[in-house]
C-alpha cells in the first residue's frame, strides 16, 4: 500500500511542484533589468535671501511612487510629467502631505507646445515662493523612467475607479516602485564666495577722464539650479560684454582711435540674488578706497541684461536723463543708430522708479542708482517681471541657419542673428558717444564697426554655446570654478588690471544662504506591497495544509481515487 502511495505522491509532485515553482517565480521575481533603475535628479532651489526662505527645505526621499491620479498621496512620492503639470496638482500633493514630488522633464524642450512652456515659466516663481518641507525634484525623461511613470499611473488610476474588492486584489498583486535618494539631508553651505570680475581700458589725454561702466551678471537662475543654463538671461549679456571688450581694445590700441574715456568692464556674480556682487563692488569702491574710477567722473553705467532675442530694445531708467548730460547723449545716440542703421528694431525708454520696499531690486542699474550713479539697463524685455529672466526653459541657442526649419522655437532662447545685431547697435552707440560724432557732424548711417572691425558672429556663437553648455547658478560656481577662470582669461585677453572681487555673507546676519544636495542619484526599486507578503503566506499555508491533510488521510484519498479511476464493468 505504501509503495502505491509513494508512486501516487511522486506523480503528483512531478506535475504540481514544477508548476507551483514557476508560478511563484513569476509572481515574486520580475525581470532583472526592470527590478531597479538609477537616474539623476535635480532638487528645487533652497536658499535664504535677506531673511526670507525660499524653495524646498528637505532632500531625503524613501517612499513609494504614485501619480497625482491616486486618491491618497500621503507619504507617497508623487510623479508628474511636465506636460500634465499644473499648480493645482502640485498644491494637491502638498495638501495631502506627500512624501516627495518628482517632475519629469522631456530631454528636448522644443517638443513641448508653447502654451505649456509659458505656463511653466509663469509657475516657477510661485513654486519657489511656496516654502515646503516636501522634497521636490526634477528628472530628465528616459525610456526606463517613462515606463516607471506609465506603470505607476495605471496603478494609481485603477485605485480610484474600481470596487473595493478589485482595489484589494490589485493592491495585493500589482508591482510598485520604491523611490530612494542616495544623498544626505541638505545643510547650509558655510563661507560661500560669490566672485565678480573687473577689467578696464584706460582713456587717453589726462587723469580726470570720464568713465563709462559696462556691466553684465553672468549667473543663471531657475527653479532647479542644476537645470539653470540662462542662455538669454544672461548669457547674451555676457557674450555682448566680452565682444565689446574685444572691439574697443582694438580701437584703444591705436593712438588715432584711443578715445578720451575710461571704459570699465564688470562681470558681476550673484546677479540673480539681488545683485550681491554689484552691491559689494560698489561698497568696496565707494566706501573703502580713495583710488577708484567710480568715485571721480562716471559718465554713465550701462547694464546688459537679456539681449539675445526679439526685435524690441528697451532702455530701462530709474530717472529720465536730463538734456545735456552724458546719459541724455547715450539715449539720443541709441535712437540715431536704431533709426538709421536698424529701422526694423523698435526702441523705447522705460521709466520705473526704484522701490526700496520690494524684497529684491528690479534691474541691476538700480544698485548704481541707489549710490547716485547714473545708470541704465538695456534689454529686449519690457518688464523686469518677465518669467524668461528666471526659468530653466532658458536653455536653447538657435543659429540663423536653423530658423524656419523643422519645429518652431519655443521658450526663451538666443537668436544669434539678433544677438549680433544688438551687439553692433551697442558698439556703434558707444563709439558715437566716446568720439562725439554727432557734434562733429557725422551722420547716423555711418558704420564704424565694419570689415576687420565688424562684430564676429562666430565668436558670439562660440561664447553662447560655451555659456549654455553647463549650468551657471550661483550656488554651483565657487571661486575655483572653470567658468570663473575662463571668464577671467577672456577678459585678460583684451583688458588691463583684471581682478577678482569676492563676496561672502556675514556670519551673524547673512544676506544670502545657499544649501547643498542640489543634485542626487535616485533609485527606483520594483517592490511588492506589504499585503502581498500576507497573501503569499496564506496561499503557501493553504497549500501545505491541503498537502498535510492528503497525507494524513491518504487511505481515504487512495480509495476515492481507485473508485474514480477504476474501469467500469459493462453490464449485459
UniProtKB/Swiss-Prot annotation:
- Keywords on this record? Developmental protein, Endoplasmic reticulum, Glycoprotein, Membrane, Signal, Transmembrane, Transmembrane helix
| Extracellular compartment segments | 36-530
Which positions make up the signal peptide?
1-35
Q: How does it sit in the membrane?
A: Single-pass type I membrane protein
Its Gene Ontology molecular function terms? ribosome binding
- Where does this polypeptide localize? Endoplasmic reticulum membrane
Q: Which GO terms describe its biological process?
A: determination of left/right asymmetry in lateral mesoderm; enteric nervous system development; multi-pass transmembrane protein insertion into ER membrane; negative regulation of nodal signaling pathway; regulation of signal transduction
Transmembrane annotation, as ranges: 531-551
Which InterPro entries does its entry note? Answer: Nicalin, Peptidase_M28
Q: Which SUPFAM superfamilies match?
A: Zn-dependent exopeptidases
Subunit structure, briefly? Component of the multi-pass translocon (MPT) complex.
Q: Report the sequence similarity comment from the record.
A: Belongs to the nicastrin family.
Role:
Component of the multi-pass translocon (MPT) complex that mediates insertion of multi-pass membrane proteins into the lipid bilayer of membranes. The MPT complex takes over after the SEC61 complex: following membrane insertion of the first few transmembrane segments of proteins by the SEC61 complex, the MPT complex occludes the lateral gate of the SEC61 complex to promote insertion of subsequent transmembrane regions. Antagonizes Nodal signaling and subsequent organization of axial structures during mesodermal patterning.
Name this protein carries in UniProt:
BOS complex subunit ncln
Organism listed in the record: Danio rerio
Report which gene this protein is encoded by.
ncln
